[in-house]
Regions:
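Short flexible/disordered coil segments
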Residues: 31-47, 60-64, 143, 202-223
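Metallo-beta-lactamase
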Residues: 39-61, 69, 76-172
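Active-site HxH/HxHxD metal-binding segment of metal-dependent hydrolases
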Residues: 1-71, 98
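A short linear boundary/processing microfeature
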Residues: 12, 108, 116, 194-195
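C-terminal regulatory/interaction regions
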Residues: 173-239
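Residue-level detector of conserved, well-ordered beta-strand and adjacent loop positions
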Residues: 65, 71, 83, 235-237
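Short acidic/glycine-enriched loop/turn segments that link adjacent beta-strands
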Residues: 64, 86-87, 228-231
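Conserved hydrophobic "DFG−1" position in protein kinase catalytic cores
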Residues: 72, 92-94, 224, 235-236
Length: 239
């Protein structure tokens, strides 16, 4: 297979968890986010299932890197790497035919999940995502034909990228406003999600909430304070 550097390493790390017990670092991470005990138990039960849902990973692969040009059939594709949704998301751009294979990095209707995970609790993937959106705006023509991994092909890439940027910036504004009174990560769901959060998407919603909170912290717009039980409370920074 042809892949970037980080993806195979992350996949092997996840696959290595198969059949293992949930680590205490993960339990502390979700407890700090405000998980109730029944959701903590669900995390423990579901941990280590990744390897059961994917094919066996190859023992070797061909690494592809940013800026590399790959020939597939009669077309030449330039590699553009995005971040935020995944630590390294490979996209392909054919300048001659004005086609961009975006995968999950640029979708026409929904915004890809951008989450903080227990393995890197202080990460700032939302800023990485915003940087990647601006990078794609600079690298692609607006009328490029975008081939996403979900929904239909589309054009007007610059408009869609700006919509994604504006959506996350607006989300952070709402989270900051909500945190005028101290909130846990699980308390800021209403500021970010219109749909109902269920047991099935609770983990993704939590990871995305922490991504917005970590980005706000990096911008010195909120502060985080742990309580005696290890739960993190977020408060808007004073003006």
């Amino acid at each position: 297979g042809w892949e970037g550097l980080v993806g195979p390493l992350r996949s092997r790390n996840l696959a290595a968890d198969t059949g293992q017990e949930a680590p205490q670092e993960g339990v502390r991470f979700y407890r700090a986010a405000g998980y109730p005990e029944d959701m903590i138990e669900q995390y423990k039960t579901r941990f280590g299932m990744f390897g059961h849902g994917v094919y066996r990973l190859p023992n070797s692969y061909r690494r592809i890197i940013e800026g590399e040009v790959i020939e597939i059939g009669t077309r030449k594709w330039r590699v553009i790497v995005g971040t935020g949704h995944a630590p390294e998301h490979v996209c392909l751009y054919c300048e001659a035919d004005n086609i961009f294979i975006s995968g999950d990095q640029l979708l026409p209707r929904i915004s890809s999940n951008v989450s903080v995970h227990p393995t890197e609790p202080e990460a700032n993937p939302l800023q990485d995502w915003l940087n990647s959106c601006n990078k794609l705006k600079a690298a692609l023509p607006d009328e490029v034909l975008v081939l996403p991994s979900h929904n239909d092909p589309f054009r007007k890439a610059h408009l869609r990228l700006q919509e994604l940027i504006d959506g996350h910036e607006s989300g952070m504004d709402k989270v900051q406003e909500l945190c005028r009174e101290p909130k846990r990560a699980v308390d800021v769901f209403p500021a970010l999600f219109r749909s109902r959060i269920t047991a099935g998407n609770y983990g993704m919603a939590t990871g995305e909430s922490i991504a917005h909170l970590n980005c706000l912290r990096a911008r010195n717009r909120i502060v985080r304070t742990p309580d005696a039980n290890g739960v993190n409370w977020y408060s808007s920074s004073p003006p």
